[in-house]
């Protein structure tokens, strides 16, 4: 699946919103009449009246080519330039009145597209539309005010987003707009945390996706993550930060530190180094471009969390032994939407990079935009390196995938969610055989 990624658009808007304190934008009226009405509503157990600023599908819907947002009008123009009508194969010149997104060459082609109407694809496209307009609405975003350290007497529930938010004391997510905004950002750190956590929602085969080899890898990592439960853990190991390698990093490398801190809060006894690796991992907002660095760029969030950016391919650092020695108790790898099977990125992943990954013998987890996207990736790895790898986790729906719908500007009817499916594998370990 080929997705056009533009960090200067919606992603940059997210980072702008995340860096602003939501409480600085909340304006509270203290008029006596409002206090009195609030008291009456509370006494009667009534819900407060909706605010005109509250997002709804009605007040967030605008056709993109008539949008009050300049960048959405530009995006509509980009779709018309890049995409083709699924019915006629011609340029797209017609905006679907149900979704507000340019989708077909003409109204006649739109009416003829039986698959589009039968599948109600326009309903998902409408969600794409209203979510994007909500981000640009100027409303307060109190949902971006994330909680701090969890008390040791409080357990985190990782069954789903709702229970995670509740047990971590997040701002109450009452609308789909709030969920979409927050889950897109938190999907990366919480996907990692949900796999490594002792209360992970993923269980062992046959009831769950985790294989026996996967259980071994996760048990090794959890042995390190919970040192107080493993008194025999060597002091030298406890003093070393756990390394999380994210290969092919792009959007996840741009997340602010306080977003990634939500991962560290799940493991208060452990410090982390997050290594963002790849030619597009370092983005300079002032220059509006990706930059290269011949040396690692280090950013320390606090004493428990550090980012390291390396703007080359993983095999370069692997061959130079920059990360040696690897430790399956202390190191884990993630690739978010790598596109192993995609024609555009197949060559950069399935050669030296994949060989180097498998040589580490550490756990590798990967996500996909949808089930087919991830299944194609895993099947390709199996077909080329099947004898050199163990499957750790069968492809499964990611409990902590983003709930925000996105669309591909090159094919506006191709919709997806970030990190929708997840799977895992590792280079095969060979057990020592004692010879007689």
From Swiss-Prot:
GO terms for molecular function: translation regulator activity. Its main location: mitochondrion. Present with 4800 molecules/cell in log phase SD medium. Residues 43-66 are annotated as: Disordered. PANTHER family: GH20023P, PROTEIN MSS51, MITOCHONDRIAL. This is Protein MSS51, mitochondrial. The lineage of its organism: Eukaryota, Fungi, Dikarya, Ascomycota, Saccharomycotina. Pfam families: MSS51_C (PF20179), zf-Mss51 (PF13824). It comes from Saccharomyces cerevisiae (strain ATCC 204508 / S288c) (Baker's yeast).
């Amino acid at each position: 699946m080929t997705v056009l990624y533009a960090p200067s658009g919606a992603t940059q808007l997210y980072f702008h919103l995340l860096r602003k304190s939501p409480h600085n934008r909340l304006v509270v009226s203290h008029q006596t009449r409002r206090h009195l009405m609030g008291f009456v509503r509370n006494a009667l157990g009534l819900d407060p009246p909706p605010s005109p600023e509250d997002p709804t599908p009605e007040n967030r819907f605008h056709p993109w080519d008539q949008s009050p947002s300049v960048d959405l009008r530009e995006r509509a123009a980009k779709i018309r330039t890049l995409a083709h009508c699924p019915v006629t194969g011609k340029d797209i010149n017609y905006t679907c009145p149900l979704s507000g997104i340019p989708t077909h060459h003409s109204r006649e082609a739109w009416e003829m597209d039986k698959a589009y109407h039968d599948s109600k694809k326009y309903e998902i496209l409408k969600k794409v539309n209203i979510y994007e307009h909500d981000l640009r609405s100027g409303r307060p975003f109190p949902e971006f005010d994330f909680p701090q350290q969890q008390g040791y007497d409080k357990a985190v529930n990782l069954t789903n987003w709702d229970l995670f938010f509740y047990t971590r004391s997040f701002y109450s997510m009452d609308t789909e707009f709030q969920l979409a905004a927050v889950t897109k950002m938190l999907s990366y750190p919480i996907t990692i945390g949900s796999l490594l956590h002792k209360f992970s929602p993923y269980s062992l085969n046959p009831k769950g996706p985790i294989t026996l080899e996967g259980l071994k890898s996760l048990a090794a990592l959890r042995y390190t993550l919970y040192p107080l439960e493993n008194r025999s853990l060597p002091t030298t190991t406890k003093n070393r930060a756990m390394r999380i390698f994210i290969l092919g990093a792009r959007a996840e490398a741009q997340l602010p530190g306080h977003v990634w801190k939500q991962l560290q809060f799940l493991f208060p006894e452990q410090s982390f180094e997050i290594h963002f690796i790849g030619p597009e991992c370092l983005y300079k907002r002032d220059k509006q471009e990706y930059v290269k660095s011949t040396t690692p760029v280090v950013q320390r969030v606090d004493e428990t969390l550090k980012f390291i950016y390396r703007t080359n391919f993983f095999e370069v650092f692997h061959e130079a032994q920059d990360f040696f020695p690897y430790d399956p108790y202390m190191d884990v790898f993630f690739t978010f939407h790598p596109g192993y099977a995609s024609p555009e990125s197949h060559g950069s992943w399935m050669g030296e990079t994949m060989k180097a990954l498998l040589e580490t013998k550490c756990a590798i987890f990967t996500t996909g935009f949808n089930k087919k996207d991830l299944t194609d990736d895993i099947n390709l790895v199996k077909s080329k390196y099947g004898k050199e790898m163990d499957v750790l986790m069968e492809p499964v729906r990611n409990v902590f995938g983003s709930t925000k719908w996105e669309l591909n500007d090159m094919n506006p009817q191709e919709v997806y969610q970030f990190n929708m499916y997840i799977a895992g594998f590792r280079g095969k370990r060979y057990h020592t055989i004692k010879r007689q």
